[in-house]
């Protein structure tokens, strides 16, 4: 007769995604080597070991802190020889853990996230997604803030008020700049951050939709960094309002430049100057900054990255009846995180694979349609993805109001 534990393990194995493949994935370690959380937490997290635990002893895996430390970046999936989707395997186990009431492992994981990962409220909102396992995200964010405030009070009690290791300037208040400022201040440096825009946050404020990251959460993250002693000076463009010589004169011993890539690359096809075409980064920035944006009922988004998914979902929330994403390769080559694409489709976004725009068509200087062409996949290019090759004679036309989302962003010159 099977024990209750054996019965539970059998049930988990029968339901577990890619269970058979798991038996053969314990040798290369690519998942661990490519994991960003491993870089931050070290020995506290190892996805390969967690995967082995799920196969050998799933009941023990349900009570493991590690189960809750995957941040959904899919770097492991993109590099895995068997293309295992570890985030989705771990999500399956998280849901079972939630159903069985195994909440303490998550509480332990939350402590590690808050104490070791910069901008924990942002990463919990945008990366870890506890709500996907049936947990209350808002309640978790409150707990995370309480943990961090307690940590800050302890730090203030133990450390001197003034930094002891000199001054460093940081240019840009996006994720990179804020992370560097956070890390340097914790190590005893005096940090001044310069931001060209009126408010700090960079791409966090500019382009992540409000349904993914609220302004309230971002404000709390920035205030926490200020409470560490970091000075943030907005409305100052280094190179225009002051130069590097000024930074040295002010006593900064080093400068970190984290200005990001805020410019979209333009599609080099005919008709790109027509009204009604807007780049996705500009579109999201207009929405986040409170500007009125008028869209049509039929919207097309070009590109297969995460920005394209955000633009498409935001457009639906603004009232579009139909939103279609055009991507020139297949789903397997899509740069967007697979779960983001799935959520977009679940919300009603249609994704057309192996389709590329050929030219924009217009009436009265306003875009009215796209002439598209179907593609086929060839040999891999320098990125490792298979090349998209046009199929001669496969052109067709889509009527639209258009949002253009180039596949890459360009550095600011």
Task: Describe the residue ranges of each PLM region.
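Ferredoxin-like iron-sulfur electron-transfer modules
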Residues: 6-27, 51-73, 153-171, 176, ...
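FAD-binding core/adjacent interface of flavoenzyme oxidoreductases
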Residues: 138, 149, 153-171, 187, ...
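Rossmann-like dinucleotide/flavin-binding elements
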Residues: 170-194, 234-244, 263-266, 282-338, ...
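Single conserved hydrophobic/aromatic residue that forms the stacking wall/gate
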Residues: 401-402, 406-413
């Amino acid at each position: 007769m099977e024990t209750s534990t054996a019965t539970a393990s059998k049930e988990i194995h029968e339901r577990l995604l890619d269970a058979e493949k798991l038996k053969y994935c314990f040798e290369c370690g690519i998942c661990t080597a490519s994991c960003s959380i491993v870089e931050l937490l070290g020995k506290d997290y190892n996805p390969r070991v967690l995967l082995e635990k799920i196969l050998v002893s799933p009941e023990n895996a349900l009570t493991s802190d590690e189960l809750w430390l995957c941040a959904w970046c899919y770097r492991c999936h993109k590099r895995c020889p068997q293309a295992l989707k570890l985030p989705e395997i771990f999500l399956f186990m998280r849901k079972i853990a939630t159903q069985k009431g195994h909440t303490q492992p998550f509480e332990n994981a939350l402590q590690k996230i808050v104490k070791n990962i910069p901008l924990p409220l942002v990463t919990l909102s945008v990366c870890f997604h506890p709500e996907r396992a049936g947990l209350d995200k808002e309640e978790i964010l409150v707990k995370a803030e309480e943990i961090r405030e307690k940590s800050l009070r302890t730090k203030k009690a133990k450390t001197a008020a003034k930094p002891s290791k000199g001054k460093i300037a940081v240019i840009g208040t996006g994720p990179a700049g804020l992370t560097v400022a956070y890390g340097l201040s914790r190590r005893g440096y005096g940090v001044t951050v310069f931001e060209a825009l009126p408010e700090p946050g960079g791409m966090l404020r500019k382009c992540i939709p409000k349904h993914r990251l609220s302004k309230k959460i971002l404000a709390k993250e920035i205030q926490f960094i200020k409470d560490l002693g970091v000075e943030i000076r907005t409305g100052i463009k280094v190179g225009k309002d002051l130069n590097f010589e000024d930074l040295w004169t002010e006593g900064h011993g080093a400068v970190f430049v984290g200005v990001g890539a805020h410019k979209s690359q333009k599609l080099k096809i005919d008709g790109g100057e027509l009204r009604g075409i807007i780049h996705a980064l500009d579109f999201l920035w207009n929405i986040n900054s409170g500007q009125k944006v008028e869209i049509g009922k039929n919207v097309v988004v070009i590109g297969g990255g995460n920005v394209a998914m955000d633009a498409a979902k935001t457009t639906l929330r603004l009232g579009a009846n139909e939103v279609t994403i055009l991507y020139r390769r297949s789903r397997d080559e899509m740069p967007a995180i697979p779960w983001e694409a799935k959520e977009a489709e679940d919300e009603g976004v249609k994704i057309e694979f192996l389709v590329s725009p050929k030219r924009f068509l217009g009436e009265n200087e306003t875009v009215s349609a796209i002439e598209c062409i179907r593609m086929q996949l060839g040999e891999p290019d320098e990125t490792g993805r298979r090349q998209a090759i046009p199929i001669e004679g496969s052109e067709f036309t889509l009527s639209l109001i258009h949002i253009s989302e180039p596949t890459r962003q360009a550095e600011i010159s």
